[in-house]
Design a protein with these regions (language model features):
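Periplasmic polypeptide-binding modules associated with outer-membrane biogenesis and secretion
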Residues: 1-296, 326
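Transmembrane beta-strand segments that form the barrel wall of outer-membrane beta-barrel proteins
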Residues: 286-296, 307, 318-337, 374-381
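Hydrophobic, lipid-facing positions within transmembrane beta-strands of outer-membrane proteins
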Residues: 274, 301-307, 344-350, 374
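C-terminal structural cap/anchor segments
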Residues: 323, 343, 348-350, 364-367
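Residue-level signature of outer-membrane beta-barrel architecture
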Residues: 311-313, 354, 380
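Short loop/turn motifs that connect adjacent beta-strands in outer-membrane beta-barrel proteins
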Residues: 314-320, 357-373
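Outer-membrane beta-barrel translocator domains and adjoining extracellular loop/strand segments
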Residues: 71, 333-339, 362-366
Length: 381
C-alpha cells in the first residue's frame, strides 16, 4: 500500500485491507503450522477500496480515491493499493445550537473558550465525535443522569470550489420516548445512598470503609465519573466479591429547576432526585490453602509443602492478613565433605495489607481520594 502524497501515511490504514498476504516466516522450509495460501477475491478487494475511501473521508479528505494495481506471475498475484487522498477539508465557521436553555447557561458553548472545535482545524469525524463525548461527559458529571451523546448531532454545509466546511453542533431537548413531548433535560441530585448486602442482613465492613470507597455523595449532583470511581474503589477491597450500583428516581420529586451557574448550584437547581443503592457482596473472610511440591537439585530429590492462612477482612476494613508456613526436605547424596545427609528448611512469613495509606494526620478527603495500599511484612527462616 502506498500514497501519491508524501504527507500522507498510507501504512496507518493497513488495518482496512481485508485480505492479508501469507506470512513469509519459514518460507524456505516446510512448515506444517503456517497459514494456508490466501486466495485472491475480487469482491474483498473492491470492499477494501471502499473501506479505504471511507476512512480517508472520515479524516477530512472528502475527494479521496483508491487505485488497485494487480500483477500476476504464475499462480501468484501481487495487489497494490494506491491511495489518492487529495486536499484535506478544514473547519470553517463553527456554531453551537443548544435548544436547552439550562444547559446553555451551564456550559456557555457560545463562547469560543468553551469550544474544542475551532475554524481552521482539520475536519475529521473523530474530532466531531470527541466533541460530542466531551460535552456529554461534562453534563453527565453535572447531574444529567439520562443524558448521552445521541442528543448531540452535527450538520455540515460546503460551498462548491472551497475546501472548508461550515459546522453546526445541535444539542436537542430531552424525549423520554419517541412519542413523548420534548422537554428540558432533567437534572438529578442524589438524595440517599443505601448499602445493601446479598449475603446477610448486614455488610461485614465498617461504615467508614464504605463511605471512603463511595465517590458519589448525598446532596451532590449525579456524576458518571464518580460512579466509575466508586466501582473502582470497591474493586480494590479484598473483602468485596462484586458490587452492583443501581439508581431509583424518587417519585414526585419533579421540581421547577433554577436557571443559573452550576458552580453556585443550590437545592433548587435540580428538578429530580435519585436514591443510590449500592449492593455489596463480600468474599469468605478466611481461607486455608495447602500446596505440596517436589524438588530436584542436581539429582537430589526432595519435597516441600506450604500452608497458608488468609483473612481478607481482619478488622472489618478489608485488611488482608496472610500467614504462610513452609517446610522443605531434601536428601543430599554424593556431596564431598557434607556430613549431614538430610537438608531441612522451615520458614514463616506474615503479611498485613491495608487498602489505604496508613499515616497520621490525614484528612478524610485525602483518605477518600488516595488509592494506595500499605503493607507490613515479617519473615523468619
Amino acid at each position: 500500500m502506498e500514497s501519491d502524497s508524501d504527507d500522507y501515511d498510507a501504512g496507518a490504514l493497513k488495518q482496512y485491507v481485508r485480505q492479508k498476504e501469507k506470512p513469509k516466516l519459514f518460507s524456505l522450509f516446510k512448515n506444517p503450522f503456517s497459514r494456508k495460501p490466501v486466495i485472491y477475491d475480487t469482491l474483498q478487494a473492491r470492499l477494501t477500496c471502499q473501506d479505504l475511501v471511507k476512512a480517508m473521508q472520515n479524516q477530512g479528505f472528502m475527494h479521496a480515491g483508491v487505485s488497485l494495481n494487480t500483477t500476476t506471475e504464475g499462480k501468484k498475484l501481487d495487489a497494490k493499493y494506491i491511495l489518492h487522498p487529495g486536499i484535506p477539508y478544514v473547519m470553517g465557521k463553527v456554531e453551537y445550537d443548544v435548544e436547552d436553555e439550562n444547559i446553555q447557561n451551564i456550559l456557555h458553548l457560545d463562547e469560543p473558550d468553551n469550544q474544542n472545535l475551532k475554524p481552521g482545524m482539520r475536519f475529521s469525524v473523530e474530532a466531531l465525535d470527541n466533541e460530542r463525548k466531551r460535552i456529554a461527559n461534562l453534563l453527565m458529571d453535572d447531574g444529567y443522569f439520562r443524558f448521552n451523546k445521541d442528543f448531540i448531532y452535527f450538520s455540515a454545509d460546503t460551498i462548491a470550489g472551497q475546501n472548508d466546511i461550515a459546522l453546526t453542533l445541535h444539542l436537542t431537548k430531552y424525549k423520554a420516548s419517541s412519542n413523548a413531548p420534548e422537554t428540558d433535560h432533567p437534572r438529578y441530585q442524589i438524595r440517599n445512598i443505601n448499602y445493601l448486602s446479598n449475603d446477610s442482613d448486614r455488610i461485614h465492613l465498617r461504615r467508614q470503609v464504605l463511605l471512603n470507597a463511595t465517590a458519589l455523595k448525598e446532596g451532590r449532583p449525579y456524576s458518571a465519573s464518580a460512579l466509575q470511581r466508586t466501582y473502582n474503589n470497591f474493586a480494590r477491597l479484598q473483602a468485596v466479591k462484586y458490587t452492583n450500583i443501581r439508581f431509583a428516581e424518587v417519585p414526585d420529586s419533579n421540581r421547577i429547576a433554577y436557571v443559573g451557574e452550576s458552580q453556585n448550584a443550590g437545592d433548587d437547581d435540580f428538578n429530580r432526585l435519585l436514591d443510590c443503592n449500592i449492593q455489596v457482596s463480600t468474599n469468605k473472610p478466611s481461607t486455608i490453602s495447602f500446596q505440596p511440591e517436589g524438588t530436584n537439585t542436581a539429582g537430589d530429590f526432595g519435597a516441600a509443602a506450604s500452608l497458608t492462612y488468609t483473612n481478607r477482612n481482619l478488622f472489618r476494613g478489608s485488611e488482608q492478613l496472610s500467614i504462610e508456613f513452609r517446610g522443605a526436605y531434601e536428601a543430599i547424596t554424593g556431596l564431598e565433605g557434607y556430613q549431614d545427609q538430610n537438608y531441612t528448611e522451615y520458614s514463616v512469613e506474615g503479611k498485613l495489607v491495608f487498602p489505604r495509606f496508613v499515616a497520621p494526620f490525614l484528612s478524610k478527603n485525602f483518605r477518600r481520594r488516595q488509592t494506595a495500599n500499605s503493607e507490613l511484612s515479617v519473615s523468619w527462616d
